[in-house]
Amino acid sequence: MARIGFYGRLAERFGREIGIDLPDDATVATVRAQLGGLDPATIRALVNDATASEQTSVGPGDRVDFLPPLSGG
């Protein structure tokens, strides 16, 4: 099971953290598809605290964080 963390408006939608089961060949794109509505053009992904691409592998025990655009000053 992978842990998925959400911040900002995403935490309001999904909660701060959930666990999901993934196939053996899962990637960040797989996680986005399973959750739905996480546009890669605007929502940044981190895997185990490192910036991730859509092709980054995600396995059991990994943590994926999704961060919406930040604003303010």
Regions found by a protein language model. Name each.
Residues 1-72:
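Ubiquitin-like/PB1-type beta-grasp interaction modules and other compact soluble beta-rich domains
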